[in-house]
Amino acid sequence: MSLRQYFVERDPFTSRAFFPVFSKEDLTGPEGVERLVAVRNTEEIMGVALNTAFPDVEARYKAFMGRLTRPEKRLNVVGLGDVGGTLVTALKLLGDDIREIGIYDPNESLCRRYEMELNQVLDREKPVIRILDEAELFDCDAFLFTASRGVPPLGAAGDVRMLQFEKNRDMLKTYTKKAREACFSGLFCQISDPVDQLSRCVFLQSNRDENGTYDFAGLLPEQVAGFGLGVMKARAAYMARRMGVNPSTLRAYGPHGAGLVIANSPTEYDSDLSDELTRLTASANREVRALGFKPYIAPAISSAALSILALLRGEDFHGAIPMGGVYFGCVSKMTPAGTVVRAEALHPELETRIQKAWAELKEGEASCRT
């Protein structure tokens, strides 16, 4: 598909590298959460806007789209802990259009176990599971990062996701450097917590040269996506059913944790009901922890496996995407010209809540630059 190209120059810290153009107004349109209410006809793409603030943006855009449009993709997964192991299992069962899943973990026995067991699943020849060497990590179409340091023990107080931030941010530096050195042109899927903040770290870390100067020659903002919102939507639906509320009109926005926004409806918004749904959804993981288990099955399947496959297939997915200098959770889909968010009319109170959640992420963005 050949698209007309429009060249723009925007601040690379807060803007997209490429995006679909449906009308000339898009060339000067907003970058933040205002996009969620910018309702317009998105049936026919007029072209693609390329941001020249990113070096060689045209070639990098084409390389990325070349990866995403391959009929059978190769995925590499780093980290075979609770989430990673469940994710690989789900991808094996659901990924008919995935050719190969590469797996990597410092624990070689874990790698051997998953390679043996998942390649012995009856009548599931694809995807093939293969153990990776470290040098092969970024030889793929999508890189899935689930590794985590310092997962809080059962009974830990506070937002257990944010307790992992500094250790996981520092661990990521090794991998973002490798992605930069490999000139990685695929999709970097950030799965370990806190998803939204770490997605921003991935983008920023990869775009520093050896002197620490930002040159924006690493990953494009669209090459990074965070996967934590899917399970929040699923948990909200579960809680709604328990309350006798129809889950079909539910909406989920924002981060996977503090700042999450669950709405009972985009237009028939009930603030009290939505606040209660948000509270129950945000604390759902603690219900599982109270039973003596770590809550990793639903996140690995809903936030990671199903959402990543939906993105790769060009379907609507729940995930954190670049939005005005942060990675913000919403429903969007990947097109040949870039990401299109689900824009719709929103109740004014809901719009205010979303703006507040975005502003809180923006306030904490400085910690992503360390």
Predicted regions, residues:
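Conserved S-adenosyl-L-methionine
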Residues: 93-100
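Conserved beta-strand elements of the Class I
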Residues: 76-78, 189
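Rossmann-like dinucleotide-binding core of oxidoreductases
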Residues: 192-267
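Conserved N-terminal Rossmann-fold NAD(P) cofactor-binding segment
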Residues: 100, 104-140, 149-152
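Long, compositionally biased stretches enriched for glycine and/or charged residues
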Residues: 8-30, 240-370
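Hydrophobic/small residue at the entry helix of a nucleotide-binding pocket
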Residues: 83-86
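Rossmann-fold NAD(P)-binding glycine/threonine-rich loop
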Residues: 2-14, 153-217
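Glycine/serine-rich phosphate-binding loop and adjoining beta1-alpha1 elements at the start
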Residues: 1-74, 104
